[in-house]
Swiss-Prot record:
The lineage of its organism: Bacteria, Pseudomonadati, Pseudomonadota, Alphaproteobacteria, Hyphomicrobiales. UMP binds at G54, D74, T135, G136, N137, P138, Y139, F140, T141, T142. Pfam families: AA_kinase. It comes from Azorhizobium caulinodans (strain ATCC 43989 / DSM 5975 / JCM 20966 / LMG 6465 / NBRC 14845 / NCIMB 13405 / ORS 571). This is Uridylate kinase. It is found in: Cytoplasm. InterPro entries: AceGlu_kinase-like_sf (IPR036393), Asp/Glu/Uridylate_kinase (IPR001048), Uridylate_kinase (IPR011817), Uridylate_kinase_bac (IPR015963). The gene is pyrH.
Length: 238
């Protein structure tokens, strides 16, 4: 695929991004908009994998407590990601692009179990591959799962969709002096304890020499722009 800086991408979408203006769950017009952007990236020539979080339904680390152990809570969160992936799969197919949901937690009556080689075949055949269930293990975030799947699937970059247009020196919502990085290394992201992704995700990306492109999902066309190496982004790279 000549001319594309990232021929095979993994897009990480938070569960909260699917809420739109809703306080909980899914906002169908927002899901449809994100699906159209994924289809546009595919039409550009990129092979597209997607990891979706589950925070719009349940976040395991938040609900774990005295009466609910962390492992059980995390597995509940993984199931939430399956629901989100199925919704996004339907929206991608409604936008005219074949899609497949694959889950790290086997549930064959609902979707395919995740395995590396079948996932790569789906990508080569032009399908948008939605990766549900996180890593399949508790105590790992979907950000870490996204970097893991990107490394496994030989992706050229992780496109991390957030609510802000890149990585800042501090939270721009609370600190008016915060400035945005254009570029930063994995080592710097770890040393500065930046919260846009967890440390395990940055460390794994460093080990795999995998760039992470951070951008705002709220900006129309941002996924396609980031896939082309354009737009208002922060690049986290070796």
């Amino acid at each position: 695929m000549p001319g594309l800086p990232y021929p095979r991408i993994l897009v990480k979408v938070s569960g909260e991004a699917l809420m739109g203006s809703e306080p909980f769950g899914l906002h169908p017009p927002t899901v449809a908009r994100i699906a159209r952007e994924l289809v546009a990236a595919r039409e550009l020539g990129c092979e597209v994998a997607v990891v979706v979080g589950g925070g719009n339904i349940l976040r395991g680390a938040r609900v774990a407590g005295e009466d609910l152990d962390r492992s059980t809570a995390d597995h509940m969160g993984m199931l939430a990601t399956v629901m989100n992936c199925l919704a996004l799969e339907a929206a991608v197919e409604a936008a005219g692009q074949p899609a497949r949901t694959m889950s790290a937690i086997p549930m064959p009556t609902v979707c395919e179990p995740y395995a590396r080689q079948p996932a790569q075949r789906h990508l080569r055949r032009g399908r948008v591959v939605l990766l549900a269930g996180g890593t399949g293990n508790p105590y790992f975030t979907t950000d870490t799962g996204a970097v893991l799947r990107a490394a496994e699937l030989d992706c050229d970059a992780v496109l991390k969709a957030t609510n802000v247009d890149g990585v800042y020196t501090a939270d721009p919502k609370t600190d008016p002096t915060a400035t945005r990085y254009e570029r930063i290394t994995h080592d710097q992201a770890l040393a500065y304890d930046l919260k846009v992704m967890d440390a395990a995700a940055f460390a794994l990306a460093r080990e795999a020499s995998l760039p992470i492109i951070v951008f705002s999902i709220r900006d129309p066309g941002a996924i396609v722009a980031a896939a082309q190496g354009e737009g208002r982004v922060t690049v986290v790279s070796p």
